[in-house]
Amino acid sequence: MASFFDDDQPSNLTEFSVSELSGSIKRTIETAFDQVRVRGEISGFRGQHSSGHAYFSLKDDKARIDAVIWKGSFSKLKYRPEEGMEVIATGRITTFPGSSKYQIVIEQMEPAGAGALMALIEERKRRFTAEGLFDPATKQLLPFMPKVIGVVTSPTGAVIRDILHRISDRFPVHVLVWPVKVQGEGSGDEVANAINGFNAFQPDGVIPRPDVLIVARGGGSLEDLWSFNDEAVVRAAAASAIPLISAVGHETDWTLIDYAADVRAPTPTGAAEMAVPVKADLEAQLAGLAARLAGAVNRQMDHRRQNLRALARALPSLDQLLALPRRRFDEAASGLGRSLELNTMTKRQSFERAAAKLSPDMLVRRLVERRQRVSERAALSDRIIERLIERQKANLGRIDATLTAVPARLKAQTGRSRDRLDSFSRRADSAVINDLRRARSTVSAHDRMLQSLSYKNVLMRGYAVIRGQDDRPLSRAAGLEDGRAIAIEFADGRVSAVTGEGDKASPPPQAASATTTPAPGRPNPLPKSPKKSEPPAGQGSLF
């Protein structure tokens, strides 16, 4: 039994324990792969861990390796890792002796070329579109005349100077600048925080809340503009309650914030022009409306004045009105002298008779009665005069109120006229745009129909067109003389040719085939060889 367990064949291999072997493998691998660059696709990325580290895998079509980015290295990355993103990672290989596993500790990471960045942009665009962040129905209209404009850009670049200069030229308003980095590490977070910060302002706060926002940056490469493709920036722009204008790069540069913004400007200067109108144009429009209003008022006054004159002409003249009263007055004046004499005589007689009957007591009573009657009439006259004065004051008050309300009504009418004019202008612009679109669609359809019906499509399949000297197509051989110049048109050009002699007396191939068709089952007879023609007399043979 002892010989069964004894090793009769000694070995020269070194004996390791498991921990010794694992440690040796760890030292060998970490020494050999102390600094490596690996290209692969990110898989299993779920964002940063609560500790700040990031854990995921790099894979290709044949293998997979675990990867980790420590918190300090993650904050320095220019491009944040995303699921499915193809990257080139730089780092070192480490192993875990306790579980026989290895991983790469990534220190630097960048996309694997512009193609990877474009693929990532397209993937984000599809995802954001599915979420409704780019829905045109959520776009806000820009205010016609903003009082405060917020600008998110670099405070030291030429962009902010161009924006301020353009706004000052067109319509000077209050501008708030939120300084941010527009490229590099952390720039995307700064832009998103700036948009959210402007939206957090209160309308009646110490710092006024902007009526419109401009997010601007100058031109650059895809890597320079990458901050404006950041998910945080896109979501902040889409969620902004303040209308937002994106002006990133040149007209040919498109970033994801352009799709999320309410309006996209081709340049920062164009964004300033969209934000404010031209003050001189507004003043000219107001002057024109004021002139039209003054003209309308003058025309109305002239019309009323003409009506008044027409009514005045319809009234009789003053002489006609006073003719009859004057006649009556003259007649009365002529008989007044006699009437006065008779009346005086009658009154004197009556007075004498009454004086004979009067006594001192009666005279006193009559005098008291007359004085009392005069006092009552004087009081009544005072009350009547006071009522007349109050009535005239009320009439004057109503007239004053009417005259005071005339400017307000004219101002309201001016506002309504201005609103109607703006509405008509917008409807006219919309109608012109729709007509242009329909015309462009009609022209495109006609062009496609012409292309499909062109005979050159037939030439491309191997056919040809024979044209005469007048460049008209020839469709029959009849009437075509020998020696006539013709042109043969192929798909790639034309060649010239001359018609030669042909057997015009021979029947067409169809007729000949119809008359010589053999019976079924019999072989086709061989054609007879033509007889040799004899040369004319007196002419030698060449053979």
UniProtKB/Swiss-Prot annotation:
Subcellular location: Cytoplasm
Ranges for region Disordered: 498-543
MF GO annotations: exodeoxyribonuclease VII activity; nucleic acid binding
Annotated catalysed reactions: Exonucleolytic cleavage in either 5'- to 3'- or 3'- to 5'-direction to yield nucleoside 5'-phosphates
Role played: Bidirectionally degrades single-stranded DNA into large acid-insoluble oligonucleotides, which are then degraded further into small acid-soluble oligonucleotides.
PANTHER family, A to Z: EXODEOXYRIBONUCLEASE 7 LARGE SUBUNIT (PTHR30008:SF0)
Protein name as catalogued: Exodeoxyribonuclease 7 large subunit
Origin species: Allorhizobium ampelinum (strain ATCC BAA-846 / DSM 112012 / S4)
Gene that produces this protein: xseA
